[in-house]
Each structure stands twice: as C-alpha cells, then as structure tokens.
Amino acid sequence: MQCVYVCDTLEPTFRDLQKVKKVKGKTAIPCGEYDVRYRMSMKFNQNMPYLEDVPNFKGIMIHTGNNPKDTQGCILVGVNPRGSNGIVMPRLVSSRDSFNRINDLIYKAIKSEEGVKVIIMNV
C-alpha cells in the first residue's frame, strides 16, 4: 500500500463514542480503515467518493468545503492555512483544487482495480 499526502482535511469534532453519544452531522468518523467507493450524490448530482462500512454512520462523502459548518459529518478536503503565529486555522482553502486532485487519484485507482482506503486517525 502506498501512502501519499495530497491535502489536509476537516471533519466534525472527535467524540469518544465509548463515553458519549454520537451527534448527527457533528461527530468525527471513528478511527479505522475504510474502503472508498463511488455512489450517486443527490446533493452534488454526480458520483462522489463515499467511505464504506463506517460503524454507526451513513453517507460519509469526501467533498469540497471551507468551514466546519460545511462538513455535515463528511470529510472536507483542502489546505489548512496558518495564522501569523504559525498555528493551523480551523478552516480550509483551495478546496476545489484539492478535491479535483484527490478525486482524480481515487478514480484512477478504482478504475485500475487497485482499490482505495482512507485511514482515520486522531492526531
């Protein structure tokens, strides 16, 4: 398996689901390794990359967005800007460019039957 940095991501708040309840659209995806497949998205009216078999979650897409309110429980892709103090800002820029890059890689890998996995870690 080849791991390649393509972009940064933004998703909802981490919640330890062993201790607290999931909050729909506001809870980070549990740590784990998930297959990616394409499915039709009614929201975007096109085939989009979705994470498969995430426990207690449905419809987790990888898509564009810039702010935490844009996630609705999905993974947003882009570049985390840094403030003048060097601290990462809780938002994304260049989301569309990042999505186009990652979507192209996902599409090529699935088409060539390599398969694609997303690994979620809390760092």
Residue ranges and their predicted role:
Residues 1-116, 121-123:
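Cell wall/extracellular polymer interaction/catalysis modules
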